[in-house]
Amino acid sequence: MWNIKEEDLDQFRITCRNRLSPEGATGFMMGTIIFVSLLMFFIFVALVTDGWDYYSTFFDKIIVSIELVLYSLQIIFLILYLFPKARYKFQKLQTLVVILYAFQLGTITFTALVLPGMTDYSIDRMTLICVGLLFIGAVIVHIVTTIDTFKQASEGAFSMDERSQSFFSETKERMIKGSMVYNLVLLIIIYFDNDYDFDTLILYVVGTIVMHAVAIGAAEFQLLVYCRFKFKSFHMTWEENERIRKRNKKFKTKNK
């Protein structure tokens, strides 16, 4: 579909060795797990005090079950990647794990809003439909931005020559503007359907912004997965990383 060449990804390779390096990805994982844990705490408290009977509907039980499975996987992978050598030995797997973390980060706020006990506000059928549409919108945004990112990569947008372009292309800008209108309409419907106060509306706005920001940013993660699995230059061994680290340390010491 796309003829992505390794030599056309010099700029993205630099990004992968800095912000998207195994250490950078582990930092993202740690930040995400802290945020997610704050909201998962309410689920654990409800299960410990009242058991599964606290979640009366089949929908609630399904959502809680999914969140528990995802959270358990996140904990397991985080423990694995806390070991420096494991980050490099399993760095291809780590790219997939980062996408899992991104999904959890983007959706956990709405989990907090729709499950009973996590807020003091009731959720009716219309609100659930609107939340579902917000999620579908984010999925569409992610698909379009991912396709556009791969198209940019095939055209040399992430190279270091005259073809170099910003990650935020015209396609992404149009998608962002369109999603803003789409999300605004759904948020207005949620607000008037439930007669929420302003503070609750802010939670929905924040959740929407986070979800769509992750949907757009995760397109870069998808390209990282592709590059790590296909191109050797995107795969750094532990020994190579140690040599570079020692060289940089020696250079900094020399310049002091």
Segments and roles (model prediction):
Residues 1-31, 229-256:
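N-terminal juxtamembrane cytosolic/stromal segments of multi-pass membrane proteins
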Residues 2-3, 68-81, 138-158:
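Membrane-water interface of transmembrane alpha-helices
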Residues 39-45, 105-127, 179-203:
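Alpha-helical transmembrane segments and their membrane-interface junctions
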Residues 54-67, 122-144, 207-212:
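Alpha-helical transmembrane segments
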Residues 66-104, 158-170, 174, 227:
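Cytosolic-side membrane-entry/anchor segment at the start of a transmembrane helix
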Residues 77, 95-121, 252-255:
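C-terminal halves and exits of single transmembrane alpha-helices
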Residues 150-171, 232-247:
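Juxtamembrane inter-helical linkers in multi-pass membrane proteins
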Residues 174-256:
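C-terminal transmembrane-bundle signature of multipass membrane proteins
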